[in-house]
């Protein structure tokens, strides 16, 4: 398997874009291999510019829950493009997608469409602060909520630490309005509220953490957050940009039966086009302009192409789709555990529906500290060998893999076989 064309393309890209990419992970630095440039996808497969075929478990980092080039999505996108790409005014497509989202997401009575997950989270934080009249936000170590200043915060030591900037360019004053605590740790949350409860506008959480690998909530964690925020009059915010419509038909909140005050969405609801959304109770959402005084706007918010792609994607998902995801997920999870044990490779497999994370350590992995104990050198070796076997995985130990309705049992069998061959090679060097 060669990457000659990708290598040449990357050399040119480096002269034009910082690091040669428009999102850092695409540089493949953490796995020490050339950045792969993709050409096209179909079903569960993706093809690079050198002509290599891969079973795709990245799926554009989650949005393509129906796989690549879904016929219904593509057909209706063509029809939408023929009408025009953007109008700067409302369209019927916005209503169709909004109705579907409100019907399926338990917490959402009204929804505002935006153009990215980062927009959704930053606007939700502003809304929470404006609605409560409080400034502080609680987030969790290892949870990523986009790249807005108030959420790019590094966790400090101790139980509840006022944030320090995790990136140059984030003012320390902004960071101090964010409290970071360990994921899955209710004692830390209680301590944070004992210290700052009257100033906390809300708690934002990934109901299944997906940016330290896949880390599901321990039993009682989400309900505990619901109870504590209710006690202190703070808002509970679920960042379901990744988990929305992926963990379950009614999102993670339906799957775990814990209902937040506000929900952030993205990825799947755009079917591969740029999109985000946030929604919640009417009384909170009606604080947003033009009804209320909390300002939010966007040139391309609710654009007809993303609305069409999102509607045509969600309309094809049924409860049976998630039964299929669980069938494939069980198969892949069991297979990974067996081949890892066969070759004495330390591996912990976490899964929530069609999100699967594998950590090269002995586990368990329930928080960011435990995820960080993974063998990154071994992961890098594994990644390169899996690419040679025609399996496209996220080029980072701290990202999850995804399934689609286009994946087949044959894909899963081939993937398990590829892991078997890979572990055979890297453990016998």
Curated annotation (Swiss-Prot):
InterPro entries: 4pyrrol_synth_GluAld_NH2Trfase, Aminotrans_3, Aminotrans_3_PPA_site, PyrdxlP-dep_Trfase, PyrdxlP-dep_Trfase_major, PyrdxlP-dep_Trfase_small
Source domain of life: Bacteria
Subunit structure: Homodimer.
Residues bearing PTM N6-(pyridoxal phosphate)lysine: 267
Organism per entry: Staphylococcus carnosus (strain TM300)
Family the entry assigns: Belongs to the class-III pyridoxal-phosphate-dependent aminotransferase family. HemL subfamily.
Pathway in which the depicted protein is active: Porphyrin-containing compound metabolism; protoporphyrin-IX biosynthesis; 5-aminolevulinate from L-glutamyl-tRNA(Glu): step 2/2
The keyword Ribonucleoprotein is assigned to this record: no
Catalytic class of the enzyme: isomerase
Gene3D superfamilies: Aspartate Aminotransferase, domain 1 (3.90.1150.10), Type I PLP-dependent aspartate aminotransferase-like (Major domain) (3.40.640.10)
Molecular-function GO terms, alphabetical: glutamate-1-semialdehyde 2,1-aminomutase activity; pyridoxal phosphate binding; transaminase activity
Swiss-Prot/TrEMBL cofactor(s): pyridoxal 5'-phosphate
Any single GO BP term: protoporphyrinogen IX biosynthetic process
Documented EC number(s): 5.4.3.8
Recorded name of the encoding gene: hemL1
Subcellular location, record wording: Cytoplasm
GO cellular component annotations of the record: cytoplasm
Protein name, as recorded: Glutamate-1-semialdehyde 2,1-aminomutase 1
HAMAP family xref list: HemL_aminotrans_3 (MF_00375)
Alphabetical UniProt keywords: Cytoplasm, Isomerase, Porphyrin biosynthesis, Pyridoxal phosphate
UniProt cross-references to PANTHER family, sorted A to Z: GLUTAMATE-1-SEMIALDEHYDE 2,1-AMINOMUTASE, GLUTAMATE-1-SEMIALDEHYDE 2,1-AMINOMUTASE 1, CHLOROPLASTIC-RELATED
Catalytic activity annotation: (S)-4-amino-5-oxopentanoate = 5-aminolevulinate
């Amino acid at each position: 398997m060669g990457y000659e064309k990708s290598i040449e393309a990357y050399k040119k890209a480096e002269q034009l874009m910082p690091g040669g990419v428009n999102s850092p992970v695409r540089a493949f630095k953490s796995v020490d291999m050339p950045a792969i440039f993709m050409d096209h996808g179909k079903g569960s497969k993706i093809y690079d510019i050198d002509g290599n075929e891969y079973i795709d478990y990245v799926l554009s980092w989650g949005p393509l829950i129906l796989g690549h080039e879904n016929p219904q999505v593509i057909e209706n996108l063509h029809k939408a493009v023929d009408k025009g790409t953007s109008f700067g005014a409302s369209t019927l497509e916005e209503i169709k997608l909004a109705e579907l989202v409100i019907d399926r997401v338990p917490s959402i009575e009204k929804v505002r469409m935006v153009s990215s997950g980062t927009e959704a989270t930053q606007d939700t934080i502003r809304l929470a602060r404006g609605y409560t009249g409080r400034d502080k936000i609680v987030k969790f170590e290892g949870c990523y909520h986009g790249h807005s200043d108030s959420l790019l915060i590094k966790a400090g030591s101790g139980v509840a630490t006022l944030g320090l900037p995790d990136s140059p360019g984030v003012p320390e004053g902004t960071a101090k309005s964010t409290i970071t605590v360990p994921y899955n740790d209710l004692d830390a949350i209680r301590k944070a509220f004992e210290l700052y409860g009257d100033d906390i506008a809300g708690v934002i959480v990934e109901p299944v953490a997906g940016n330290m690998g896949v880390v599901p909530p321990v039993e009682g964690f989400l309900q505990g957050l619901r109870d504590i925020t209710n006690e202190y009059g703070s808002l509970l915010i679920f960042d379901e940009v990744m988990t929305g419509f992926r963990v379950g038909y009614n999102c993670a909140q339906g799957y775990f039966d814990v209902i937040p005050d506000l929900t952030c969405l993205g990825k799947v609801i755009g079917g591969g086009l740029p999109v985000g959304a946030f929604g919640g109770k009417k009384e909170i959402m009606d604080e947003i302009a033009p009804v209320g005084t909390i300002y939010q706007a966007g040139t391309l918010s609710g654009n007809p192409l993303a609305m069409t792609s999102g509607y045509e994607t969600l309309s094809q998902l049924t409860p049976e789709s998630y039964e299929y995801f669980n069938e494939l997920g069980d198969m892949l999870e069991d297979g990974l555990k067996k081949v890892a044990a066969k070759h004495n490779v330390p591996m912990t497999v976490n899964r929530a529906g069609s999100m699967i994370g594998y950590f090269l350590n002995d586990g368990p992995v329930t928080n960011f500290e435990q995820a960080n104990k993974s063998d990154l050198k071994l992961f890098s070796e594994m990644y390169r060998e899996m690419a040679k076997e025609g399996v496209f995985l996220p080029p980072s130990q701290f990202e999850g893999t995804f399934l689609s309705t286009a994946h087949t049992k044959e894909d899963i069998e081939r993937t398990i076989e590829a892991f078997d061959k890979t572990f055979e090679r890297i453990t016998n060097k």
